[in-house]
Design a protein with these regions (language model features):
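Short, Lys/Arg-enriched C-terminal cap helix and immediately downstream tail that follows
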Residues: 135, 163-164
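Conserved acetyl-CoA-binding loop-helix of GNAT-fold acetyltransferases
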Residues: 104-106, 112-129, 145-153
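Conserved GNAT acetyl-CoA-binding A-motif
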Residues: 130-139
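Conserved acetyl-CoA-binding loop of GNAT-fold acetyltransferases
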Residues: 152-162
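Short histidine
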Residues: 140, 147, 159, 171-173
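GNAT-family acyltransferases
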Residues: 1-109, 130, 164-191
C-alpha cells in the first residue's frame, strides 16, 4: 500500500544499480553532473540554484513548519561499481493513490548505457507490485529521442502528442506516454 511508504522509502536493487533516497552525503556526487546544461536542453531552462548547489536540497528552509508525509518516490540512481549517484528517477504528483508522473535525469557522461531504462524498470516494478497505483504517465519532447526510447523500452504506450504545449518551461511539441498496471502485468507475464 502507498501508505506504507509515506515516511520511509525503500531501496531497490538491479544488476548494476541501487535506487535509494538521496542523503546529504550525496551532494559531492550530485555536484559533478546535476548542474550540467545538457540535462535541461528540452526543459527550456538552466539548472536551478538547488541543482547548482545540491547541498541546498537537504536544508529545510522552514524547519518550524510541520510537513505532511510525502507520497512521492524520489530515488538517487547509484552505480554499484563506484557507489556514486549518477542520476535520479522519481514517481511524483501522485493523485488519489491512483496515478503518478514519472521523471528521470542522468549524468550526461553516462548517457547511452541503459542506466535510466534499468532504473525506471525497477521503479515501475516496485510501484505496481507494492502500491495501489494503477497508472504511470510521462511526457517527453518529441525531439528527445533518447527519453522517448526509454519510455517505450519500459512498456509505456504512446498516447498522443501535444502540439505547441507547455512542458516544464518551454513551449514545444511533446509526446504523452502512459503505462497501466494491467498492461505492465501482461507484459511481465509474456517475458
Amino acid at each position: 500500500m502507498l501508505s506504507d511508504y509515506l515516511t520511509a522509502k525503500p531501496t531497490l536493487e538491479t544488476p548494476r544499480l541501487l535506487l535509494r533516497p538521496l542523503v546529504p552525503e550525496d551532494a559531492a556526487s550530485l555536484r559533478r553532473w546535476l548542474a550540467r546544461d545538457e540535462i535541461y536542453t528540452y526543459w527550456g531552462r538552466k539548472a536551478s540554484k538547488g541543482e547548482r548547489e545540491p547541498e541546498l536540497m537537504f536544508i529545510d528552509p522552514r524547519p518550524w513548519v510541520k510537513r505532511k508525509p510525502d507520497p512521492d518516490f524520489k530515488w538517487g540512481i547509484v552505480l554499484k561499481e563506484t557507489n556514486a549517484v549518477i542520476g535520479d528517477v522519481s514517481i511524483f504528483d501522485i493523485e488519489n493513490a491512483r496515478m503518478g508522473s514519472v521523471g528521470y535525469r542522468l549524468d550526461p557522461d553516462l548517457w547511452g548505457h541503459g542506466y535510466v531504462t534499468e532504473a525506471l524498470r525497477a521503479a515501475v516494478e516496485f510501484i505496481f507490485t507494492h502500491t495501489e497505483l494503477d497508472r504511470l504517465h510521462a511526457t517527453a519532447d518529441v525531439r528527445n529521442t533518447a527519453s522517448n526510447r526509454v519510455l517505450e523500452k519500459c512498456g509505456f504506450v504512446h498516447e498522443g502528442t501535444i502540439r505547441h504545449g507547455k512542458m516544464v518551461s518551454v513551449y514545444c511539441d511533446y509526446h504523452i506516454w502512459g503505462l497501466l498496471r494491467e498492461d505492465w502485468e501482461q507484459m511481465k507475464a509474456t517475458t
